[in-house]
């Protein structure tokens, strides 16, 4: 594809014969501002800005400001040279333009999960996982049908599996604080959520039992080999990190043994699902489905929880005791101590503030910050105040933290507002929920075989709610230090105040 003509954004409106062109909704059609600069050198500089000199938020905000507030821009996206053959994208940085990426009739999502580069298929047993298939690919519907059936069939296992993981995790947090603390949440979350994910989806022996204590290390290593071009601030100094992570692919053979052990575990754990699929869902080779289940469980589910839950705890820690007291009151009214376990149904029906907190965390910090898709045809993309022509084949990119913090959609858009989605009848919250799009679709939408919305959407939301409800059934309040990093915040508990026991005593770890 030839490079599109760059535009400064300073009044170069689309026109034919001196007449201004208007979009179907009456917006003036402009040329897309921005540009791609000098091949190789400009993408390299943009990569350094994105990862090290500015950070993602400032990278985009500075370019929006440079082009007069335009929120549809031509930019280079990392990793650039030498990992990505073509770093050029059209960035969609507001809630309205971003929605193009959620319309499967307008964008092709084949091989766009990770943006401008595609991991080696050797990391997936030679198969292309569901997440890399376009919705129009016949294999997409077949594989997603199995995954959706699995998620629905196992939903009633989520709450008991999470309770077990939560109890073990926070018993360890309590013990660490009593021993002198502080205690890092991320390390425990990383360990216990892998067992939870596999117990919830498949049952049987968890990875820590079947594979030993190194199960998490093996899973995370496999994730790193896929995502290292998108990681930053994990190796010091940064020039060394940039050379190691962003310049060349880590060779898949270095993780072949670990992936083989992971696959062997899932071949046993998911045997019943694989057997059922062979009978009831013909057309999917058993080996291909096995590697897809590995990807769904480890990349989609576990990888998502690894990022998402620290963000929830981060926002709760920053909100402080006043919000904690409200949440504790709501949770204990719906699920009093000694009155049975917290269920997904109880949270759904009786804990509106808990639900709102989780949706707000997903709005502020979606587990996957970006979406990509390739234009299926020439089209017009509309922002709030302008329209832009996009050519067939151009790669569209959406930076979700800007789209879901759009001040033209949300009041106090850059703030964490715990009760934003609380509404007695639900009517006021629903229009806002349409702009919570972490799942590759609106929160009001439903995953289907023919769309790209996350098949585990309801499970992810349920786990977030169970985390918040579990915290405030067990504790009155807590304090934690938060270190912001590009992928996930590091949350370290400094104190937890246990809810009063039956004798009225309270325990505190410091």
UniProtKB/Swiss-Prot annotation:
What upregulates or represses it? By red (R) light and far-red (FR) light in dark-grown seedlings. Not induced by abrasion.
Q: Which GO terms describe its biological process?
A: fatty acid biosynthetic process; oxylipin biosynthetic process
Keywords from UniProt, A to Z, are: Fatty acid biosynthesis, Fatty acid metabolism, Heme, Iron, Lipid biosynthesis, Lipid metabolism, Lyase, Metal-binding, Oxylipin biosynthesis
Family per similarity comment = Belongs to the cytochrome P450 family.
* Residues reported in the UniProt entry to bind (13S)-hydroperoxy-(9Z,11E,15Z)-octadecatrienoate: 300
Name used for this protein in its record: Allene oxide synthase 4
Name the cofactor(s): heme b
* Classification via PANTHER family: ALLENE OXIDE SYNTHASE 3, CYTOCHROME P450 26
- Pathway info: Lipid metabolism; oxylipin biosynthesis
**So where does this one cross the membrane?**
none
Asked if the Swiss-Prot or TrEMBL record annotates the protein with the keyword Lipid biosynthesis, the reply is yes
Question: Which segment of the chain is annotated as a signal peptide?
Answer: none
Q: What does this gene product do?
A: Involved in the biosynthesis of jasmonic acid, a growth regulator that is implicated also as a signaling molecule in plant defense. Converts 13-hydroperoxylinolenic acid to 12,13-epoxylinolenic acid.
Q: Name one GO molecular function term.
A: iron ion binding
Q: What is its EC number?
A: 4.2.1.92
Q: Which domain of life is it from?
A: Eukaryota
**SUPFAM superfamilies with a match to the protein in the record:** Cytochrome P450
Tissues in which the protein is found: Expressed in dark-grown seedlings.
């Amino acid at each position: 594809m030839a490079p599109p003509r760059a535009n400064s954004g300073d009044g170069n409106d689309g026109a034919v014969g001196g007449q201004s062109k208007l979009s179907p909704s009456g917006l003036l059609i402009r040329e897309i501002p921005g540009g791609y600069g000098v091949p190789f050198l400009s993408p390299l500089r943009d990569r350094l800005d994105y990862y090290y000199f500015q950070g993602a938020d400032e990278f985009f905000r500075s370019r929006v400001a440079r082009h007069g507030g335009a929120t549809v821009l031509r930019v280079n996206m990392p990793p650039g040279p030498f990992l990505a053959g073509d770093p050029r994208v059209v960035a969609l940085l507001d809630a309205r333009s971003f929605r193009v990426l959620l319309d499967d009739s307008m964008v092709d999502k084949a091989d766009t999960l990770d943006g401008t580069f595609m991991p080696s298929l050797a990391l997936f047993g030679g198969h292309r996982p569901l997440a890399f298939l376009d919705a129009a690919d016949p294999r997409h519907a077949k594989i997603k049908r199995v995954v959706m059936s699995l998620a629905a069939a196992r939903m009633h296992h989520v709450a008991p599996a999470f309770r077990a993981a939560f109890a073990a995790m926070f018993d360890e947090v309590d013990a660490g604080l009593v021993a002198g603390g502080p205690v890092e949440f991320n390390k425990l979350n990383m360990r216990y959520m892998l067992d939870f994910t596999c117990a919830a989806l498949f049952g049987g022996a968890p990875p820590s039992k079947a594979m030993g204590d190194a199960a998490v290390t093996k899973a995370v290593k496999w994730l790193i080999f896929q995502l290292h071009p998108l990681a930053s601030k994990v190796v010091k100094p940064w020039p060394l990190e940039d050379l190691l992570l962003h310049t060349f692919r880590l060779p898949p053979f270095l993780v072949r043994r670990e992936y083989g052990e992971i696959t062997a575990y899932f071949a046993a754990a998911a045997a019943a699902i694989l057997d059922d699929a062979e009978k009831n869902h013909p057309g999917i080779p058993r080996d291909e489905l096995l590697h897809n289940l590995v990807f769904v469980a480890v990349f989609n589910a576990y990888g998502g929880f690894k990022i998402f839950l620290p963000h929830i705890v981060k926002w709760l820690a920053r909100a402080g005791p006043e919000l904690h007291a409200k949440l504790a009151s709501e949770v204990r009214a719906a699920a009093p101590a000694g009155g049975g376990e917290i269920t997904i149904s109880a949270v759904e029906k009786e804990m509106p503030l808990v639900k709102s907190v989780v949706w707000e965390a997903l709005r502020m910090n979606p587990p996957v910050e970006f979406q990509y898709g390739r234009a299926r045809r020439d089209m017009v993309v509309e922002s709030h105040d302008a329209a832009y022509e996009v050519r067939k084949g151009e790669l569209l990119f959406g930076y979700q933290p800007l789209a879901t913090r759009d001040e033209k959609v949300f009041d106090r858009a850059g703030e964490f507002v715990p009760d934003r989605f609380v509404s007695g009848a639900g009517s006021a919250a629903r229009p806002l929920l349409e702009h919570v799009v972490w799942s590759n679709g609106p929160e009001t939408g439903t995953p289907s075989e023919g769309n790209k919305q996350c098949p585990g959407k309801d499970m992810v939301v349920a786990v977030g709610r169970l985390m918040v409800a579990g915290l405030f059934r067990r504790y009155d309040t807590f304090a934690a230090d938060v270190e912001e990093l590009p992928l996930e915040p590091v949350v370290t508990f400094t104190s937890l105040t246990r809810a009063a026991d039956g004798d009225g005593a309270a325990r505190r770890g410091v």
